[in-house]
C-alpha cells in the first residue's frame, strides 16, 4: 500500500488523481491533502471521502470553515496550516509518493522538501522547472529522487524512452541512446483558425474552452496562447537534457498523439491515447508497472484521421518568447513565467485583451534588469521583480 500526499488536491490534476485512487484502493491510500484553500467545500468533500491523515491549507481566512466543515461531518482528519506544515507533509517518512500539482512557484519549497527526502514525485507543475530547472535537476541528482512528469507531453516522451534513460533524467545524453529528436505535439488551442485581427476580441470564457482537454483556467489560457507549449519546450530541455536542434514542435489538432521520439534509424515511437489526464497520472502512480483505470480505450476506427501541421509562429508570439528565453538563461525563463502569471490573471479578470498577454510578457523581458540567479532566494527575488513590473504595465491599460 503506497501512501500519497497531493499538493493541489482541489485542482484538475488533484481531482483526477483521487479518481484513480478510488479505483485502486488496494494499492494506494491518501496520507495528506494540500490546497491553497479557496475551494473549501471541495476540500471538505475530499477529506470525507478519502479520509486522509492530514489536510493542510495556506489561506488562513478559510481555516475555521475547514475545521467546522470536518467537525460537522465527523471527519477525523487533522487540520494543519502554512508552509512549514506542508513541507513536513511532503517530506514525511510515512509518504511514498508526492503529487506536485500546485500552480506557479507557490509550491517550490514543498517540492524541494520532497526531493530532499528522496521521494517518488509525480510532477505536473511545469512552472517550477521553467523558473528553476537548473537547481531542480541538481537536487534530484543529489538526493536520488524519482521524478516522473505527468503532463501528457513529457509523460509521453518518458514512456517512450529506454528504461535506463528514465532513471537518468537530466543527466543522460540522448545521443548515447540512439535518439535523434524529441517531438512535442500541440493542438493549437481554441483559436487556431481564428483570424489574427479577431484575436483581440476573444473572451476569457472562449479562451478556456479548449477543444480537447478539460483543464484549469490558467493552463487553458496558456494553451490558447501556446505559452504552455513554450513552457513544455523549456521543461523538455531540463528533463531530457536536450539542445535546440533536438526538439521539434508540431501542431496535431486531435491530441491523440501526445508526443513522439524520433530515433537515428528513422523509426518514430509515438505515445497515443484519448486526451485524458488520468492516463499519464496512472502511469506515474503505478510506475514501473501499469495499473488499470476506468478510461476509454482508443478506437482507431472513430479516430482514423490524424493530422499534422507546422506552427505559424506569428499566431503564437508567447511560444516564440518562451523558446527565445530558454536560450537566454535561467533568469529569462524565470522572468517570463512570472510575468505570464500576472498577465494571464489580468486577462481572466478582463483588465487586458488576449493579445496583450504576449505584449506585457515581452515588455517585462525587455525592460527588467535580468540577472542569472545563483540560489532559490535569488529566483524568488527575480520572480517578485518581474511580477511587480508586469503589474505596473497592466495599470497603464
UniProtKB/Swiss-Prot annotation:
Protein name (record): 1-deoxy-D-xylulose 5-phosphate reductoisomerase
Binding residues annotated for Mn(2+), in chain numbering: 151, 153, 232
Needed cofactors: Mg(2+); Mn(2+)
Coiled coil: none
GO molecular function ontology, one term from the record: NADPH binding
UniProt family annotation: Belongs to the DXR family.
Pfam families: DXP_redisom_C (PF08436), DXP_reductoisom (PF02670), DXPR_C (PF13288)
A single GO BP: isopentenyl diphosphate biosynthetic process, methylerythritol 4-phosphate pathway involved in terpenoid biosynthetic process
Cross-referenced InterPro entries: DXP_reductoisomerase, DXP_reductoisomerase_C, DXP_reductoisomerase_N, DXPR_C, DXPR_C_sf, NAD(P)-bd_dom_sf
Gene designation per UniProt: dxr
Pathway linked to the protein: Isoprenoid biosynthesis; isopentenyl diphosphate biosynthesis via DXP pathway; isopentenyl diphosphate from 1-deoxy-D-xylulose 5-phosphate: step 1/6
UniProt entry keywords in alphabetical sequence: Isoprene biosynthesis, Manganese, Metal-binding, NADP, Oxidoreductase
